[in-house]
Amino acid sequence: MGSLSIWHWLIVGAVVLLVFGGKGKISDIMGDVAKGIKSFKRGLSEDEEKAEAKPVGEPSLRSLDHQGAGDPLKTPDARKIG
């Protein structure tokens, strides 16, 4: 239990290479994450601007003419027949 196996050393080596190896790989990764977050926020603000641009009024519904609506048996034409 006190000794480390080969898998432990491989994981430690990979972490060390990731942190200290190359030309700022961590900073590149964090820069990409920051760009993604900024792009996401920009997309959200554009969606909010589009939603605010739409007028919030009554929905455009076609109106129906209800002047002749009623009991069809009580119309003047129906009384003449019966």
Curated annotation (Swiss-Prot):
Q: How does it sit in the membrane?
A: Single-pass membrane protein
Q: Name any one Pfam family assigned in the record.
A: TatA_B_E
An annotated GO cellular component of this protein is:
TAT protein transport complex
Membrane spanning stretches: 1-21
According to its UniProt record, where is this protein mainly located?
A: membrane
Ribosomal protein as a keyword? no
Gene Ontology BP annotations: protein transport by the Tat complex
Q: Which InterPro entries match?
A: TatA/B/E (IPR003369), TatA/E (IPR006312)
Name where it's found: Cell inner membrane
Task: Indicate yes or no for the key word Cell cycle.
Answer: no
Top-rank taxon of the source lineage equals: Bacteria
**Under the GO molecular function aspect, what terms does this record hold?**
protein transmembrane transporter activity
Report keywords, A-Z: Cell inner membrane, Cell membrane, Membrane, Protein transport, Translocation, Transmembrane, Transmembrane helix, Transport
Span list, region Disordered: 43-82
User: What does the similarity note say?
Assistant: Belongs to the TatA/E family.
State the protein's purpose: Part of the twin-arginine translocation (Tat) system that transports large folded proteins containing a characteristic twin-arginine motif in their signal peptide across membranes. TatA could form the protein-conducting channel of the Tat system.
Q: Subunit info?
A: The Tat system comprises two distinct complexes: a TatABC complex, containing multiple copies of TatA, TatB and TatC subunits, and a separate TatA complex, containing only TatA subunits. Substrates initially bind to the TatABC complex, which probably triggers association of the separate TatA complex to form the active translocon.
Q: What is this protein called?
A: Sec-independent protein translocase protein TatA
Q: Which organism is it from?
A: Methylocella silvestris (strain DSM 15510 / CIP 108128 / LMG 27833 / NCIMB 13906 / BL2)
- Name of encoding gene: tatA
